[in-house]
């Protein structure tokens, strides 16, 4: 007789195949229709706020795997906090000014750009930026990221530009902004100043030369310097020695050379010059003020100064000083000693007339010519080359130079700003903790902030220059007047209007009292644009109070957005703009290499999405320890499809076996649950507790590992396998089946919620297949986090089960051995004989005697004192084929097979079920 129709086999419309690529688009449409973002916020009305403030990506291209990683991480945090009961708004932003966009636009325009006005170029830049805002918006939405996509903040919008100027005005009012001729990073290809945050370090091959400077007093007395920038020698005005280092005066032929004693051996080894004849030892301070002949221009001199930054790591301990081309040179040479600033290099990196015969040469091309001239003069001691880490432009990737120009700066020490920032850093929670020391050291060491750029695409610095006396003025009254214009017309007005319209009617030159001005055309560093986002978001959005709860970006932002934001916020508001800062690493390829088009190892997130679905990308991210650098390749991503399949199958099994289960009417109270079910419910509480702890510490890879292990080893291979018999065989409404279903229902709901922040599409699909009584909201994203219930953990039961599951492992090994020997096929063919190792284990097995067959999925379990075949830690195990006949309904063996006419060939349990006698 075929009993198949008498079994409670799983039934569900939840498909086995995910078809993610198409299914995700369906959910995106549904979320759009329900206005998901506002709907979820509405469900948390009146709840405490948690605000993750979005660091704006740059709108100059499609999203890449790094920006995808960042947005998904933020989405996981926001969705988790929402489920924990917070009102968690998320307003995306875009950074839209600056050189990279202007660079791309100039490439597109080609020669035409030379005929265009600044206002026309700016219009093209705006169109370009907004085009990519729209492109990136759709790409981020495709990743399943929930946000206020219709109302983002965009740094080029007039209402945002006003806030940039407002923050800037505060700095001007407080006296932190000044103008000065100083050496700053300069990109000769992009023809603009650069800030520290716009610098990248790459290996670069440079000349390495030793040059001797002749004393003006004694033609045979020389100081030997070492430099890797021969092109800066025309700008030389001094030589720096350390005041306290010991220097040796070495006899070389008829000449005496000064070299730091500790560097003599290294110098000799590199140059091949014998330095053993030391005639005198002196301190650096002994030579202070002495004058030496300029290495390039014989009519100029070079003065010895003292500087404690001089090191004994490389070179000679004697440093050539050019205040026009170096930060320390400027501080020690110009500020402390009053040496002149010579900077004979124009904006394109070519020498000016001041450089004499080198005029018109590009600086790097001039290196060889200068070295040859030094050789002819007989003062080149040694020349070679060196590969070292050197600053490069973030945009064009070319090497930069230090060049002295008139620029605007923010003084980081005026009004004790640096110290206040350091104090605020210590009040912030940094995750990982090392972020605190990283940003602290950067703030402690940073120079004043060069904030002016010689480009048109940016927020203009509203400074004016008096035509009568040449005074350049940056006045809060002018900034405020301009802000009112910007509110209505945007910052393009600065480039379109006459200067008289841009300044207050009563404004005159503070130096000469005249009212005849011209506009200055410098623009602000874009790090001020993005750094002022706290001011915009907290004044424009009621649901974004200051300070904001969290900033979450890559670890490079310790010197970027985290850095600029805290300086501007402390200046404007007196405190850090964030309470918590979370950083992630960078994405590398499978071999740990940086992604680059030249290596052909770039993984396009949208390609992954179109091939596998956004869910797989989200799952890959959750599997990664993102605090460190993360590896990715299409192969690595593909591995997640198998993990995804296992998780999906777990949900399908749960849904299939809960078909017809009414969570209100069919639930079994805890005290009536069967033993195995009570254990499983206790384990679920432990899973909920650990998952919550991991989410709270943002350790999503631990959530992933916990859930994957739970689904595969505890559910599929253990609990769900064990209860299949009860689910399929017992009466539909019996306590045996309902007890298992009650716990499976708890598992389904909790697991769905735990995975919802990560697997946002699939858990929405699971939610749509729940019993209507389980769907309180239109979306799983509005649900509350599963509650950890201590009362569901029976400590004694949990401890007992640790031992029982250890015994089960031994039983499974013994079963497998007999399967290999063809003694049994399915485990239900077996009878297991257990020999406990001691009385404690014997008592344990006696205590749980009634559930052992179910737990081991065998037909019979008996205890014995005889020796067993497999020696385990707690028991010895013998497996033999079960006696009797196989029940045609449940496949268990019994010696009491039914001969009933109505239900022949079944065991007593199945007979009772079929007769309706087993409840």
Swiss-Prot record:
Keyword Iron-sulfur: no
Reaction catalyzed: tRNA(Ile) + L-isoleucine + ATP = L-isoleucyl-tRNA(Ile) + AMP + diphosphate
InterPro entries: aa-tRNA-synth_I_CS (IPR001412), aa-tRNA-synth_Ia (IPR002300), Anticodon_Ile_BEm (IPR033708), Ile-tRNA-ligase (IPR002301), Ile-tRNA-ligase_type1 (IPR023585), Ile-tRNA_ligase (IPR050081), M/V/L/I-tRNA-synth_anticd-bd (IPR013155), Rossmann-like_a/b/a_fold (IPR014729)
Keyword Protein biosynthesis: yes
Binding locations of L-isoleucyl-5'-AMP: 553
One of the Pfam families matching this protein, by short name: tRNA-synt_1
Cofactor(s) needed for function: Zn(2+)
Residue interval(s) of motif 'HIGH' region: 57-67
EC number: 6.1.1.5
Gene3D superfamilies: 1.10.730.20, HUPs, Ile-tRNA synthetase CP2 domain-like
Binding site for ATP: 597
Subunit relationships: Monomer.
NCBIfam families: ileS (TIGR00392)
Family from the record: Belongs to the class-I aminoacyl-tRNA synthetase family. IleS type 1 subfamily.
The protein's name in its UniProt record: Isoleucine--tRNA ligase
Species: Thermotoga petrophila (strain ATCC BAA-488 / DSM 13995 / JCM 10881 / RKU-1)
Gene name for this UniProt entry: ileS
């Amino acid at each position: 007789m075929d009993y198949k129709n008498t079994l409670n086999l799983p039934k569900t419309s939840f498909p086995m195949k995910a078809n993610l690529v198409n299914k995700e688009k369906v959910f995106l449409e549904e979320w759009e229709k329900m206005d998901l973002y506002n709907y979820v916020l509405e469900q948390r009305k009146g709840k405490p706020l948690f605000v993750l403030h979005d660091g704006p990506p740059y709108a100059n291209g499609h999203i890449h795997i790094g920006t995808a990683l960042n947005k998904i991480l933020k989405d996981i945090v926001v969705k988790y906090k929402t489920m924990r009961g917070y009102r968690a708004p998320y307003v995306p932003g875009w950074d839209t000014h600056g050189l990279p966009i202007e660079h791309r636009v100039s490439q597109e325009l080609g020669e035409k750009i030379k005929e265009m006005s600044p206002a026309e170029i700016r219009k093209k830049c705006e169109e370009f930026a907004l085009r990519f805002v729209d492109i990136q918006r759709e790409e981020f939405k495709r990743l399943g990221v929930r946000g206020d996509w219709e109302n983002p903040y965009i740094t080029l919008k007039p209402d945002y530009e006003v806030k940039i100027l407002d923050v800037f005005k505060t700095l001007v009012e407080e006296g932190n902004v000044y103008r000065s001729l100083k050496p700053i990073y300069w990109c000769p290809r992009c023809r603009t100043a650069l800030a520290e945050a716009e610098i990248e370090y790459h290996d670069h091959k440079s000349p390495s030369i030793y040059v001797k400077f002749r004393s003006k007093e004694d033609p045979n007395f020389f100081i030997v310097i070492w430099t890797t920038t021969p092109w800066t020698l025309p700008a030389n005005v001094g030589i720096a020695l350390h005041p306290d280092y010991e220097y040796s005066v070495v006899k070389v032929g008829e000449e005496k050379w000064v070299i730091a004693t500790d560097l003599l051996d290294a110098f000799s080894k590199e140059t091949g010059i014998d330095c053993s004849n030391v005639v005198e030892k002196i301190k650096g301070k002994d030579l202070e003020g002495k004058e030496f002949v300029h290495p390039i221009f014989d009519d100029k001199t070079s003065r010895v100064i003292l500087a404690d930054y001089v090191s004994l790591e490389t070179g000679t301990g004697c440093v050539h000083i050019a205040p026009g081309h170096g930060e320390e040179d400027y501080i020690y040479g110009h500020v402390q000693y009053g040496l002149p600033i010579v900077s004979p290099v124009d904006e394109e990196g070519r020498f000016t007339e001041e450089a004499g015969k080198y005029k018109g040469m590009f600086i790097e091309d001039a290196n060889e010519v200068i070295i040859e001239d030094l050789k002819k003069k007989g003062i080149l001691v040694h020349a070679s080359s060196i590969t070292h880490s050197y600053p490069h432009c973030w945009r064009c990737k070319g090497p930069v130079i230090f060049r002295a120009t008139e620029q605007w700066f923010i003084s980081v020490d005026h009004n004790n700003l640096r110290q206040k920032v350091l104090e605020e850093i210590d009040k912030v929670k940094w995750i990982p903790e090392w972020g605190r020391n990283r940003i602290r050291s950067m703030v402690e060491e940073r120079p004043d902030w060069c904030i002016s750029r010689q480009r048109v695409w940016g927020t203009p610095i509203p400074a004016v220059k008096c035509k009568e006396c040449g005074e350049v003025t940056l006045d809060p009254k002018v900034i405020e007047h301009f802000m009112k214009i910007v509110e209505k017309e945007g910052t393009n007005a600065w480039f379109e209007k006459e200067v008289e319209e841009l300044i207050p009617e009563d404004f005159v030159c503070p130096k000469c009292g005249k009212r005849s001005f011209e506009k200055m055309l410098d623009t602000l560093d874009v790090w001020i644009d993005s750094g002022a986002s706290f001011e915009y978001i907290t004044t424009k959005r009621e649901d974004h109070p200051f300070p904001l709860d969290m900033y979450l970006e890559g670890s490079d932002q310790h010197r970027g957005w985290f850095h600029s934001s805290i300086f501007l916020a402390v200046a404007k508001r007196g405190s850090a703009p964030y309470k918590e800062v979370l950083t992630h690493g960078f994405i590398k390829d499978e071999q740990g290499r940086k992604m680059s088009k030249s290596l052909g190892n770039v993984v396009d997130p949208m390609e992954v999405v179109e091939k596998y679905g956004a869910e797989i990308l989200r799952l890959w991210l959750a599997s990664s320890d993102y605090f460190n650098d993360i590896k990715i390749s299409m192969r690595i991503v593909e591995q997640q499809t198998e993990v995804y399949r296992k998780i999906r199958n777990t949900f399908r099994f749960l849904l299939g076996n809960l078909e017809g289960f009414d969570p209100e009417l069919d639930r079994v109270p805890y005290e009536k649950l069967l033993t195995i079910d009570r254990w499983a419910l206790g384990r679920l509480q432990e899973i909920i507790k650990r998952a919550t702890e991991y989410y709270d510490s943002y350790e999503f890879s631990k959530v992933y590992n916990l859930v994957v292990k739970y689904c595969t080893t505890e559910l599929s291979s253990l609990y769900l396998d064990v209860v299949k018999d009860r689910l399929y065989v017992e009466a539909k409404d019996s306590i045996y089946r309902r007890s298992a279903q009650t716990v499976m229902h708890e598992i389904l709901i909790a697991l769905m919620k735990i995975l919802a922040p990560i697997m946002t599409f699939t858990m929405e699909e699971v939610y749509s297949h729940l019993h209507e009584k389980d769907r309180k909201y239109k979306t799983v994203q509005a649900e509350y986090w599963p509650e950890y219930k201590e009362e569901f953990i029976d400590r004694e039961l949990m401890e007992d089960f640790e031992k029982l599951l250890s015994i089960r492992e031994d039983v499974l090994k013994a079963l497998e051995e007999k399967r290999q020997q063809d003694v049994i096929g399915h485990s239900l063919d077996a009878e297991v004989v257990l020999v406990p190792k001691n009385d404690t284990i014997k008592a344990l097995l006696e205590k749980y005697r009634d559930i052992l067959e179910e737990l081991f999925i065998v037909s019979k379990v008996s205890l014995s004192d005889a020796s067993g075949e497999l020696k385990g830690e707690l028991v010895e195990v013998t497996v033999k084929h079960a006696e009797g006949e196989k029940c045609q309904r449940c496949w268990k063996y019994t010696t009491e097979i039914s001969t009933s006419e109505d239900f022949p060939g079944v065991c007593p349990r199945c007979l009772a079920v079929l007769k309706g006698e087993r409840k």
